[in-house]
């Protein structure tokens, strides 16, 4: 339903969406950091070498109050509690060689989440080859909640792809670059893979739904200003250029995107802001629209604007507590809006107000998810199906996601 991955990837994000898995947000990164320290102690004390195993089991409770068939069914039943995700992961190191792999099972589908091999040239420079998270904009996530932000639904949050990436840390300056030749690996069908992106619909009836991301180059630079021991501000710039392959005509278009972001940590407060602009220029035959592209994720397909601006603003507050196993509460409000460039009257918005609860190995999201013309939040789609479907109504989903990490 979004600061880079280290060589030890014990806790990764879980996918958002209607009826499919949720995501692990910024608080969950803290769990990952703690796991990494524990794993380092368990590894060879002299070299840090070793192999570590982990996983997670998650369940989801949801009450859908949207104006949709799913919303009506949810109201009739008083809500639903369902299996969300089971995953296993392994990562490790042998001298300068590192690796990580993760596989996930959802309800009726499963696929590879992560699978890469890396090499540490120095303590500050690493390369990785394989399926991995793409560094673009706010990292590792552009939201705090279970449902992600609008960036996720247009393919720019928690994005994974297959390619070669380089990370370099020069004091307060972090530089990431990579070339990603293919979308994430899937087992069956064009859209059965982790991570959202432009992809073909296996059941398409026209070439508007035939495009696929290929040979994408990403670059990101971020600088952190340390104000004092408990306050810092990161500012960053990201860019992307890539190809859009038409599986029907075998012609190629192109894609460009850039993002400016600020991520501030001020004692217990965290503020994230980002402006992202992207332009997909697909090559289509006469008579077919180039204003809309098909997005694919975990077997789901939906329409998204070919060109849009995405604005994100999030505020979060951490409250340490001592209440049984509960050690921290994170309160947050995440807001994002997607504005289609080709028309002024089509926009989408997502606002999530919630709380993340840390209790030992259990991590819980309690969210009020409100969407306007957002996929998986109501019946009206993505404000792209024609003027009659563009509505200003906000739809609401109440969601609780509970996960046990081991």
Stretch-by-stretch model annotation:
Residues 51-59, 99, 127-129, 175-177, ...:
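Transmembrane beta-strands of outer-membrane beta-barrel proteins
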Residues 214, 223, 228-341, 349, ...:
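Detector for outer-membrane/organellar transmembrane beta-barrel domains
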Residues 67-76, 186-212, 247-249, 281-304, ...:
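Solvent-exposed loop segments that connect transmembrane elements
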Residues 86-88, 115, 164-166, 219-221, ...:
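Membrane-embedded beta-strands of outer-membrane beta-barrel proteins
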Residues 359-399, 403-405:
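Predominantly the C-terminal beta-signal and adjacent terminal strand-loop region
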Residues 43, 74-78, 105, 117, ...:
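Outer-membrane beta-barrel proteins
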Residues 3-17, 22-58, 63-67, 406:
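N-terminal periplasmic/intermembrane-space "pro-region" immediately following the signal or transit peptide
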Residues 46-70, 75-187, 191, 215-218, ...:
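Outer membrane beta-barrel
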């Amino acid at each position: 339903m979004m600061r880079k991955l280290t060589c030890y990837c014990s806790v990764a994000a879980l996918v958002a969406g209607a009826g499919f898995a949720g995501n692990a947000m910024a608080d969950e990164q803290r769990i990952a950091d703690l796991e990494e320290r524990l794993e380092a102690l368990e590894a060879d004390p002299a070299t840090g070498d070793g192999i570590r195993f982990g996983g997670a089991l998650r369940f989801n409770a949801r009450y859908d109050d949207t104006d949709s068939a799913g919303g009506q069914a949810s109201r009739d039943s008083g809500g639903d509690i369902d299996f969300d995700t089971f995953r296993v992961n392994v990562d490790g190191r042998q001298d300068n060689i590192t690796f990580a792999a993760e596989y996930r099972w959802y309800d009726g589908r499963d696929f590879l989440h992560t699978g890469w091999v890396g090499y540490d040239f120095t303590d500050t420079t690493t390369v990785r080859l394989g399926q991995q998270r793409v560094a673009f904009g706010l990292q590792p996530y552009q939201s705090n909640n279970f449902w992600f932000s609008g960036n996720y639904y247009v393919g720019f949050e928690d994005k994974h792809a297959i390619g070669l990436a380089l990370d370099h840390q020069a004091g307060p300056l972090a530089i990431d670059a990579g070339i990603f030749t293919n979308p994430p690996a899937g087992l069956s069908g064009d859209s059965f893979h982790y991570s959202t992106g432009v992809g073909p619909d296996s059941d398409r009836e026209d070439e508007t739904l035939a495009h696929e991301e290929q040979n994408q180059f990403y670059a990101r630079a971020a600088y952190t200003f340390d104000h004092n021991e408990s306050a810092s501000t990161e500012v960053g710039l990201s860019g992307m250029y890539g190809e859009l392959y038409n599986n029907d005509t075998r012609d190629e278009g192109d894609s460009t995107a850039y993002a400016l972001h600020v991520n501030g940590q001020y004692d217990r407060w965290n503020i994230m802001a980002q402006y992202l602009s992207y332009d997909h220029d697909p090559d289509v035959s006469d008579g077919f629209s180039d204003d809309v592209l098909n997005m694919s994720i975990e077997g789901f397909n939906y329409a998204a604007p070919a060109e849009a601006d995405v604005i994100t603003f999030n505020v979060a507050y951490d409250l340490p507590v001592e209440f049984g196993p509960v050690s921290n509460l994170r309160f947050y409000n995440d807001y994002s809006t997607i504005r289609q460039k080709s028309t002024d009257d089509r926009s989408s918005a997502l606002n999530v107000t919630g709380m993340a609860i840390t209790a030992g190995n259990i991590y819980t999201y309690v969210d009020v998810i409100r969407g306007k013309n957002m996929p998986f939040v109501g019946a009206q789609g993505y404000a792209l199906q024609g003027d009659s479907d563009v509505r200003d109504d906000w739809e609401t989903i109440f969601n609780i996601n509970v996960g046990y990490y081991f």
